[in-house]
């Protein structure tokens, strides 16, 4: 490794070329990073500073040629070098366009910092980017026209620097001088000696932070020989990246890798640990080569992006993807990835895939209507693949959902009906989704919901006119309060502003009113001459019956379900009386128990033979009753606990009743706040 301190001029000077490897991300610095760089330049000049450190550029020297251009492969610092190159292009162009200003020589910039003057072809350029960025940068260097429709951060940032230079806050010569004061450490590695991957990971860049998917791409491709690297990139990695939306690519790909790992590992990696988890997976995975792994990633990326971007040649599946998107069902993706692959491999049919998508959508939607907390859904779907029986695929999935209880339950028709009739639908985020599906169910000419607005049949105005008060009866205030935003009182119209607070009969008979409406949602209304509580309830029942058809409960017979119903074993039932409490320890326990149970309605208490367990999916804390105190086992690694007060003990590898590597004691009721700070960390970890 050779590290030298210099500036962009010393780095670029000479017959050199800096190349960006195919695995590096596109140029991604935005205006904020450019503003920071420009402000540093202005600040140095105005305050007469001698220098300002802006970071490092790490490269690998390619095999040197006796003559010609010495080439360097950049492994870190692409963004910084590209941005400085854009600034130099803008400064050169200003000098060319303002010939009377002779304070700097544009040829010096052009021939020494942007081009290798006596070379031809690609070797003519000091910096060569990848893919689309490559052509755009070359066109900027050569001052060639670029299509007006071209969207690129290179152009945006170049234009920013042009605007700043033209403000004349600094003279061109001052800008050139300040650029030279930007200090850069240039680190050149020896491919035969230095571990480029390890060095890359250890760098603490001050630029735009690499995403987890950036790190994974570099990890996969950096260590390969050039030919294999290009093959993997062109045949697998680049096609995979093109499936993702460009502007949001990093974020969506990070989520893809997390969901891919969740599917493979059957546990959910933390978002900021995806890269580390992927490295461990790669070491232990079933694939014998990088190509096989990347081929698998490409396959699952296709399923993933089809769902995210609602793409499928099958119209019904495409509509179901739209439902998944509307309901924000990303938590189901790890399971759905597995199901899509089984469909591709003919384990299940396309009809089975459609049915599974519908079951998952109904599960999430019914729970939403019944206001069941969603924080356990990710773990429910992550582990669902374990429940699939290949020889009874569909029934095993249906049985899994039907047999859930408590916070994992699939609300049955009775629970769903009660909630759907009385729920405040209007203030739900999914209200348009609900109304459009009720309208379009089995409709050969579906409407576009965006062409309509939601209408309250009984108006929202708390000061109702006399006609409405008369129709609703003497308890009109109670009726309005109870039913205003419920499904029975909501419909769609293209004439919301015209209807306003008008009496029901006017809304019915007016131009564009309910009587003229072709919407199925309004078919019940056209038979009426008034609107009251009974009509609201009756219409709600009709719409709820339809909702039960749209979002169906899984159909499985008792015979099909029987193999999945495990008979309850005759086990000893424990209770509070099991434990050797005295008055003091009983008080300690009651104080702690109340605080733990108040964490969430999802928390369940279970009495075991030797301890009391508190769990969401698994135990997050266990309490053992001792003679004069409570011993508490917290289900976390000791290295992960935050314990500024030092009340925890490391019991890693030591046999104790309960779960986890952290032990804490509660000796007095006054200890409860400190103890809960530790317990809450374990609870939140399980929530993630």
Which positions does each model-derived feature cover?
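Glycine- and hydrophobic-rich flexible loops that cap the catalytic core of alpha/beta enzyme folds
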Residues: 2-268, 511-518, 522-529, 533-536, ...
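Betabetaalpha-Me/HNH-type nuclease active-site subdomain
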Residues: 43-46, 51-70, 385-525, 529
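A cross-family structural signal marking well-folded subdomains
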Residues: 212-216, 221-432, 531
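Short, conserved charged micro-motifs
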Residues: 346-349, 640-644, 670-677
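Short, conserved beta-strand/beta-arch hydrophobic-aromatic motifs that form part
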Residues: 606-662
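Well-ordered alpha/beta subsegment
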Residues: 654-688
């Amino acid at each position: 490794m050779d590290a030298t301190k210099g500036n962009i001029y010393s780095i670029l000077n000479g017959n050199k070329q800096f190349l960006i490897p195919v695995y590096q991300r596109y140029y991604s610095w935005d205006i904020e990073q450019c503003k920071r760089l420009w402000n540093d330049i202005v600040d140095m000049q105005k305050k007469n500073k001698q220098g300002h450190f802006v970071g490092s550029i790490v490269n690998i020297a390619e095999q040197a040629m006796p003559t010609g251009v010495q080439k360097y492969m950049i492994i870190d610092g692409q963004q910084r070098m590209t941005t400085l190159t854009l600034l130099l292009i803008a400064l050169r162009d200003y000098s060319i366009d303002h010939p009377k200003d002779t304070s700097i020589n544009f040829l010096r910039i052009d021939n020494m910092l942007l081009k290798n003057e006596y070379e031809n072809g690609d070797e003519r350029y000091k910096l060569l980017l990848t893919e689309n960025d490559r052509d755009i940068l070359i066109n900027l260097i050569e001052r060639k026209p670029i299509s007006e429709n071209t969207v690129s951060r290179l152009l945006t940032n170049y234009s920013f620097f042009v605007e700043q230079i033209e403000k004349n806050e600094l003279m061109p010569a001052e800008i050139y001088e300040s650029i030279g004061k930007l200090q850069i450490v240039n680190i050149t590695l020896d491919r035969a000696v230095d571990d480029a991957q390890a060095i890359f990971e250890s760098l603490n860049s001050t630029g735009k932070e690499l995403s987890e998917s950036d790190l994974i791409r570099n990890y996969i491709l950096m260590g390969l020989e050039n030919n294999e690297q290009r093959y993997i990139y062109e045949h697998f990695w680049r096609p995979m990246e093109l499936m993702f939306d460009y502007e949001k690519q990093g974020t969506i790909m990070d989520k893809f890798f997390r969901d891919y790992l969740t599917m493979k590992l059957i546990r959910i990696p933390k978002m900021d640990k995806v890269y580390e988890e992927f490295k461990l997976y790669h070491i232990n995975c079933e694939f014998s080569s990088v190509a096989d792994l990347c081929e698998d990633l490409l396959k699952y990326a296709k399923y993933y992006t089809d769902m995210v971007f609602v793409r499928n040649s099958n119209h019904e599946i495409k509509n179901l993807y739209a439902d998944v998107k509307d309901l924000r069902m990303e938590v189901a993706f790890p399971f759905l990835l597995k199901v899509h692959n089984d469909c591709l491999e003919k384990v299940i049919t396309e009809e089975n895939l459609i049915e599974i998508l519908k079951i998952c959508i109904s599960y999430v939607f019914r729970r939403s209507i019944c206001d069941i907390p969603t924080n356990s859904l990710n773990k429910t779907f992550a582990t669902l693949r374990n429940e699939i029986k290949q020889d009874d695929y569909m029934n095993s999935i249906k049985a899994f959902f039907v047999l859930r209880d408590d916070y994992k339950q699939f609300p049955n028709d009775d629970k769903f009906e009660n909630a759907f009739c009385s729920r405040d639908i209007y203030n739900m985020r999914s209200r348009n989704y609900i109304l459009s599906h009720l309208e379009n169910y089995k409709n050969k000419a579906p409407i576009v919901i965006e062409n309509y607005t939601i209408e309250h049949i009984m108006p929202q105005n708390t000061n109702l006119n006399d006609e409405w008060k008369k129709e609703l009866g003497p308890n009109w205030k109670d009726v309005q309060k109870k039913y205003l935003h419920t499904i029975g009182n909501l419909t769609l119209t293209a004439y919301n502003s015209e209807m306003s607070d008008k009496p029901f009969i006017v809304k019915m008979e007016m131009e564009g009113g309910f009587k003229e409406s072709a919407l199925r949602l309004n078919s019940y209304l056209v038979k009426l001459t008034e609107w009251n509580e009974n009509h609201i309830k009756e219409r709600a029942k009709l719409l709820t019956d339809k909702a039960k058809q749209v979002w169906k409960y899984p159909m499985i017979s008792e015979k099909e379900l029987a193999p999945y119903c495990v008979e309850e074993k005759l086990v000893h039932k424990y209770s509070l009386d099991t434990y050797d409490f005295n008055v003091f320890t009983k008080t300690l326990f009651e104080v702690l128990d109340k605080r733990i149970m108040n964490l969430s309605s999802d928390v369940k208490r279970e009495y075991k033979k030797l301890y009391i367990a508190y769990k969401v999916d698994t135990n997050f804390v266990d309490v053992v009753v001792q003679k004069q105190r409570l011993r508490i086992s917290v289900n976390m690694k000791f290295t992960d606990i935050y314990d500024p007060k030092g009340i925890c003990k490391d019991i890693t590898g030591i046999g104790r009743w309960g779960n986890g590597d952290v032990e804490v004691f509660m000796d007095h009721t006054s200890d409860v706040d400190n103890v809960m700070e530790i317990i809450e960390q374990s609870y939140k970890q399980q929530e993630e």
